[in-house]
Each structure stands twice: as C-alpha cells, then as structure tokens.
C-alpha cells in the first residue's frame, strides 16, 4: 500500500489568509506548536526568507528566536524552509557563500527540511 504523508503550511502560508501579509506572530505560533507536533505531519512548512524578513519589519520579532522556540515546542516534526532560489531576506541575488551560510544557520537553529 502506498504511504501518504501530510505537509502542513499553516504557519508559513496559510496564516496569510486571516492575518494578511504580516501573518502569525511568535506567540500565536507557539500556541499551536504542541498540537501540530502531535498531529503526525511529515513536516511543517515553517518559513521562507521573505517570511523571516516580515517578522523583523512588521512584527519586530527575531525570526531566529521564533525558529528555535517553535523547534523546542514541536520536537518530533520536521520543520521546512521553502527556498526561493539564490536570495535570502532580499530581492537581490545572493552569493553562493551567503546562501551556504544562511542554510547552515537555518539547520543550526532547527530547520531539517528544505523545499
């Protein structure tokens, strides 16, 4: 029998439906993290570089702290970073070195899946 897995997009993309481009803040995410961890998702599509920039610009929150806190609150479920090519928190193309550094930081702070 074929195995079916589910990837949840609530905190990365789905939240924009109700809260506009600024999305959920860290406290809102942490409030649902334990339930999401128990739900049995293959992964939670957690963030993008744009999502991280929005956390800083509009919510005045640290996206790295958000990632670490969510990881601690949902330790069993993989967290995904949706990459948009060769850019990170900018519309400008980033160097390979910067992207490698950004990906290392993401892994070190709790991301374990890239899409």
Describe the role of every protein-language-model region.
Residues 1-19, 67-72:
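N-terminal amphipathic alpha-helix/helix-capping segment at the start of soluble metabolic enzymes
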Residues 3-6, 14-16, 43-45, 76-82, ...:
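Structural preference for beta-strand elements that scaffold enzyme active sites
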Residues 4, 65-95:
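Glycine-rich, aromatic-flanked loop segments that form ligand/cofactor-binding clefts
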Residues 10-31, 82-99, 108, 113:
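Active-site mouth loops of central-metabolism enzymes
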Residues 20, 42-67, 85-91, 115:
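Glycine-rich, proline-tolerant flexible connector loops at the mouths of alpha/beta enzymes
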Residues 28-50, 105-111:
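Catalytic domains of carbohydrate-active enzymes, especially glycoside hydrolases
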Residues 37-38, 67-76, 103-108:
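Acidic (Asp/Glu)-rich catalytic clusters
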Residues 60-64, 96-101:
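Charged helix-capping and loop-helix junction motifs
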């Amino acid at each position: 029998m074929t195995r079916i897995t589910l990837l949840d997009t609530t905190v990365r993309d789905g939240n924009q439906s109700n809260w506009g481009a600024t999305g959920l803040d860290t406290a809102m995410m942490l409030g649902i993290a334990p339930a999401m961890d128990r739900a049995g998702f293959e992964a939670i599509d957690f963030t993008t570089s744009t999502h991280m920039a929005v956390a800083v610009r509009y919510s005045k929150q640290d996206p790295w702290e958000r990632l670490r806190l969510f990881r601690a609150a949902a330790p069993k479920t993989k967290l995904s970073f949706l990459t948009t090519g060769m850019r990170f928190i900018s519309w400008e193309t980033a160097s390979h070195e910067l992207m490698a550094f950004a990906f290392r930081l993401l892994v070190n702070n709790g991301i374990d899946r890239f899409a």
